[in-house]
Amino acid sequence: MKRITLIYAWLFCLALSVAAQEKVVKLKIVQTSDVHGNYYPYNFITRQEWKGSLARIYSFIEKERREYKDNLILLDNGDILQGQPTAYYYNYIDTVSPHLCAEMMNYMKYDAGNMGNHDVETGRAVFDRWIGTCDFPVLGANIIDTSTGKPHLPPYKMLERDGVKIVVLGMITPAIPAWLSENLWRGLRFDDMEETARKWMKIIRAKENPDVVIGLFHAGQDAFKMSGKYNENASLNVAKNIPGFDVVLMGHDHARECKKVMNVAGDSVLVIDPASNGVVLSNVDITLKLKDGKVLSKDIQGVLTETKEYGVSEDFMKRFAPQYEAVRKFVSKKIGTFTEDISTHPSFFGPSAFIDLIHTLQLDIT
């Protein structure tokens, strides 16, 4: 009887030892993309309340951080500097104050950002100033400084949470030259996404030995060539053709998507896209089981979360109330008077007073 008792005691201790060596880590990855200046829950163009915005997103973040704490990773996928007067005002009017977008993202504690084509469109003076104000890295593995041949921005960010190593690799659609004048991005070039991903995946594996790899790509999933030269939307191609990614966060095409695809190595990859204007979030849960620092299993699930289901953060609005008022005054400023009604509708079919007005102003200014 004594011997049996000792055996049971030994087995119990062994079980405790095994359990002590194993642990479960839960991560929450939240992605915003194509926010397009929708920082406040108010559309300064239509002068109506807006169902999206960083103010609503922050309510969601506050709630989730209470559960996940530092295991929540917040990422932005570009096209955040253009689209609303809020962005325009701090891009070109008030260039002395810290950029509002950077201040808000710092307040929300973003872990990394990514460049989008509309961020590039603001011009180097604007986006370099914004990047310089951000407390987090803005990534761009395929944005190359032509004078050095090296990335103009950090290619990736390595994060460690609860013993888990997570790498975020950032890339932008390479079709910038097809849309934007070179004076906006002079000194830079934009390399193919698949070639860049293949190169950096080798480096990341060798140097960082990550447990989780996330692609943060400002590009959609419907790949096609522009002018026979640029693969504008290569996110899905990268997910399928470059083994190593666990999650590919997409953007640029303003199309909601959440699905899993199989890569060439036979591994499942979650691809997810929250569309635009801060209306939807990419909400990804990653559960890892580890033993002695090695990953035994990995479960990845994603959903698209509507931000309208969350209220506006009062703390956020209070913190950025002065900037809101500055933008409101700017867009409310009287700049002239029409002697008769004017409509944009005729411009779709022929000559119009509206287009004449724009052309006259352009000629006067230039």
What are these regions (language model features)?
Residues T5, T32, T366:
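Ser/Thr-centric signal marking residues that sit
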Residues C13, K69, F320-A321:
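Short, flexible coil/linker elements and helix-boundary hinge sites characteristic
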